[in-house]
Amino acid sequence: MQHAKLVVFDMAGTTVVDKGSVSSAFIQAFLSHELDIPAEEVHKVMGYRKVDAIRMLLERYYPDRKDEYPVLIPAIHHTFEQSMVDFYLADTSLAPLPGAEELFKHFKSIGIKTALNTGFTRKITDAILHRLNWKESSPVDAVICSDEVPEGRPAPFMIQELMRQCGVTDPGQVVKVGDTEVDIQEGRNAKCGLVVSVTTGAYSRNELLALKPDHIINSLDNLLLLIH
């Protein structure tokens, strides 16, 4: 893709190593409220704003408890959020995926802005950024979280806000990079010029192939072949 002005990256599984900690914490948050959700179903909602993902799973597996949702959803989310914050602040092995920081620097050197967006809240995101030293010395031009816009993915609001912050007006000059189905949907809904999936996170290559992103890459440095 020529003439790209902004590349928007997902975080966990795309630019930050995730060894299954997010889905595990999600499952445990439900279990702590005596709710059992199959792991394969949690896998499917990775990438969504977490309060939305919780509601989706409750509607599928516990529709008979709908009257309790106003209490259950924030309670499960609070448990998940605190678990993730504690995990990320304590996890000394947390690291960027190979090539992420070098890629940010490369794009900056050729005048392309970079940004991060995520289904996490700002509280969790700041814990990740702090652990990676990305909060004190940010390698990207902007970061936005799902609780800072009216709706999370697949709505286009996070990408649109990042465009505003980075001074980009044409979504055709924006590249979206992520590891989940909802990343692809978000990129399509924002009318991004290029939607790229990576196999380093929640979805396998075969799963991603069925979702028809513009490109599927095995590592971030493969982006250099797509964006000039």
Each model region followed by its residue ranges:
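Conserved phosphate-coupling serine/threonine residues in phosphotransfer and NTP-handling enzymes
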Residues: 10, 118-120
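Residues in well-ordered alpha-helical elements
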Residues: 40, 51, 98-101, 185, ...
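Asp-based, Mg2+/Mn2+-dependent phosphohydrolase catalytic module
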Residues: 1-5, 105, 121-123, 127-228
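N-terminal helical cap/lid subdomain that shapes the substrate entry/recognition surface
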Residues: 2-98, 105-110, 126
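Short, well-structured alpha-helical patches and their helix-loop capping segments
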Residues: 92-95, 117, 150-154
